[in-house]
Amino acid sequence: MSTEPVVFMDIAIDGRLLGRIKIRLFSSIVPKTAENFRQFCTGETLGVNQKPIGYKNSTFHRIIQGFMIQGGDFVSGDGTGSATIFNSRTFPDENFTLKHDRPGLLSMANAGKDSNGCQFFITTVPCDFLDGKHVVFGEVIEGYDIVKEIESTPVGANSRPKSNVAIVECGEM
């Protein structure tokens, strides 16, 4: 039995509950990256107003069929926001030990080297071209069908979904 944390996200599209995605975090390999994500799932980190910050009620703002689904920008909701549990806007790449070698991997979205924050993506295909550029830190262990349903959501400009794809609840199992 793994001692690595398992988190969940309950997903709804335009208010219609799809179901739950469960993700195992690779805390033994990338502990800082995994902990940053875990705390944003639980809401235990407080923002400047002393209210919990995190993924609850945030959206998947970028979907590219045959590649990945991206979310986690609870700051601005459009892919420009960043926050960490480390009292900084970003944090360095922890390591690139894990590869983007299969669908269902959780990886950090970034704006270049050492620019990790709160945004993440889940792969829907192997993406070896991301190796050495994005930190893999978890994998979907249940609810991959939900990931695929999100991936099939129609998108408009900038790969932005035409529907509201929201994380309506999240936490740690």
Swiss-Prot record:
Gene3D superfamilies in the record: Cyclophilin-like
PPIase cyclophilin-type domain sequence ranges: 8-172
EC top class named in words: isomerase
GO biological process, alphabetically ordered: mRNA cis splicing, via spliceosome; protein folding
SUPFAM superfamilies, per database record: Cyclophilin-like (SSF50891)
Reaction equations catalysed: [protein]-peptidylproline (omega=180) = [protein]-peptidylproline (omega=0)
Keywords: Cytoplasm, Cytoskeleton, Isomerase, Rotamase
Family: Belongs to the cyclophilin-type PPIase family. PPIase H subfamily.
Protein's name according to its UniProt entry: Peptidyl-prolyl cis-trans isomerase cyp3
Source organism of this protein record: Schizosaccharomyces pombe (strain 972 / ATCC 24843) (Fission yeast)
The organism's taxonomic lineage, starting at the top: Eukaryota, Fungi, Dikarya, Ascomycota, Taphrinomycotina
